[in-house]
Amino acid sequence: MTESAIHDRKISLDVRHSDLSGSRLVDVSLAAASFENVTMAGASMLDANLSGLSIVNANLTGMTFDDVNLSSATFENVNMAGASVRDANLSGLSIEDARIDGMTINGITVSDMIELWHANRKGAGNAQA
């Protein structure tokens, strides 16, 4: 294994079929970089600006988001079975066409909340008649 160091330079790299395990990038700009067929299991990112990042066909099992701003983010065709969201600001969050079996908010089953909402709505309609 050869070790190299690059300091204070602007360069473009085309790295293919390589093992860069254990590499360390500090104060580096990877703007517009492209990663294809990359294994980053166990990698960590601290103080990262990932605005505009697109992740497609990825396995994020066991991933942790901590102190992350996901405002204006879009999640499509996502499997979040067994995931947890804690201490989060979900103001204005929209969930559409989602399977919610067993989903809870503060310990209350969401399907029960929706059922109760529908029942109250019907009751309110009958009261006005």
Predicted regions and their residues:
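Tandem repeat scaffolds
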Residues: M1-A119, A124-N126
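Charge-dense polyanion-binding interfaces
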Residues: A129
